[in-house]
Amino acid sequence: MNSILIVDDTAFTRHVLRNMFESLGLHVIAEADSGEEAVRNYCLYKPSLVTMDITMPGMNGLTASRKIMELDKDAKIIICSAVSRHDTVIKAIQAGARDFIAKPLQLERIEWAVQKVLGTGVNVRQGDRQGKQIAEVLV
């Protein structure tokens, strides 16, 4: 089963992402609220996928992504950030991100990115009514 590490300094955003992933039938193995914790949790849990915010106290998401990629060149990282300027997206890809999702988050966009990054064989079911309601919440 594919496992996901959610990294965001905002508890509400982590909660929304967890609910989105669970509504898609995916397993959230851990959460982190900083880049440092993201790197530690990546080493501890070896998740199939990491969703990473950029702007966090301490180590930011771009630096954490680079460190994770140094540890595992095959790591799969999706950046989820409100900072979506063109240069930021380029920096995210250069740091190793496989996709970039601009906030506010939408269930359909999350589902598409997960399928793209993890591969077409991923068992992602259509979001249920509750999942779609959660996806409408602005993050």
Model region roles, listed by residue range:
Residues 34-37, 60-63:
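Acidic catalytic/metal-coordinating carboxylates
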Residues 45-51:
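Active-site beta3 strand of CheY-like receiver
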Residues 112, 119-139:
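CheY-like receiver
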Residues 57-60, 85:
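The feature encodes the CheY-like receiver
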